């Protein structure tokens, strides 16, 4: 059943609010955490990009939850990548960044198998995480 064709379910809206709260809370911490290497983005663009990325991440998690439920393998990876994202921003170690990126890619693949719209919605967040983490992990240097 299409979400737009169905009656609004208060449970779904509460779940969406929780996904948004969790993702945007991690995003808020991530945006103010110390950056050991400058992100190659104009400073004025960082806050809107973080907000958009984590907002899309929340919507993708919610879409996947609607399809597969809370106890799914895909949402386990989603929660793990969100937790790794928070921990990596507080302690940007290369191994944590690699684990975060691998977990985000696994989440993308699992979402694609279960809910294509969730995967497409999650893709910008994966690209943003890769874009931000690669220079911080020293995969390339900015001079």
Locate each region found by the language model.
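Alpha-helical transmembrane segments of multipass membrane proteins
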Residues: 22-30, 84, 131-132
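Portal/gating segments that form or line small-molecule/metal binding sites
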Residues: 32-114, 143
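Juxtamembrane boundary at the C-terminal end of a transmembrane helix
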Residues: 133-143
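Interfacial loop-to-transmembrane junctions
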Residues: 112-127
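Short amphipathic, positively biased membrane-proximal segments
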Residues: 3-9, 94-98
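Small-residue-rich segments of transmembrane alpha-helices in multi-pass membrane proteins
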Residues: 81, 125-133
């Amino acid at each position: 059943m299409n979400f737009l064709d169905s009656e609004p379910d208060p449970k779904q809206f509460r779940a969406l609010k929780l996904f948004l709260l969790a993702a945007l809370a991690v995003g808020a911490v991530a945006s103010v955490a110390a950056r050991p290497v400058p992100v190659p983005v104009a400073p004025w663009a960082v806050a809107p990009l973080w907000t958009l990325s984590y907002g899309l991440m929340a919507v993708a998690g919610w879409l996947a939850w609607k399809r597969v439920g809370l106890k799914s393998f895909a949402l386990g990876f989603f929660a793990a990548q969100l937790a790794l994202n928070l921990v990596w921003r507080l302690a940007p170690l290369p191994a944590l960044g690699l684990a975060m990126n691998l977990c985000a890619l696994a989440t993308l693949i699992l979402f694609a198998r279960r809910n294509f719209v969730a995967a497409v919605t999650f893709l910008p967040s994966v690209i943003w995480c890769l874009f931000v983490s690669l220079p911080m992990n020293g995969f390339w240097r900015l001079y």
